[in-house]
UniProtKB/Swiss-Prot annotation:
Pfam families: KOW, ribosomal_L24
Name of the molecule in the record: Large ribosomal subunit protein uL24
Key words, A-Z: Ribonucleoprotein, Ribosomal protein, RNA-binding, rRNA-binding
SUBUNIT field: Part of the 50S ribosomal subunit.
Family in the record: Belongs to the universal ribosomal protein uL24 family.
């Protein structure tokens, strides 16, 4: 997948389009990502040992990875990425806007 945990991303489509956030979790087999503060839904939680009071919780739900764009840390713009193999054999993600390595 082109997006990794901890990356800064911009949501491009849906009800949260235009919001920026940090990737909390990546689910590669379903091509989904969970982003901090984005795509929040209300979950009705029954009382349990871990949450004795119960109540309504707001949780982040996964988005399809195709609906987000990586934000470059150097140029601070949403960008597509390229992959490049360095001389030492390491595969690195490259920003298409400024050419800077993202890893």
């Amino acid at each position: 997948m082109r997006i990794k945990k901890g990356d800064s991303v911009l949501v491009t489509t849906g009800k949260d389009a235009g919001k920026k956030g940090k990737v909390l979790r990546v689910i590669p087999d379903k091509n989904r990502v969970v982003i901090e503060g984005v795509n929040r839904v209300k979950k009705h939680q029954k009382p349990s040992r871990s949450l004795p009071q119960g109540g309504i919780l707001k949780i982040e739900t996964p988005l399809n990875a195709s609906n987000v764009m990586l934000v470059c840390s150097r140029c601070n713009k949403p960008t597509r990425i390229a992959h490049k193999i360095m001389e030492n054999g390491e595969k690195v993600r490259i920003c298409k806007q400024c050419g800077e390595a993202l890893d």
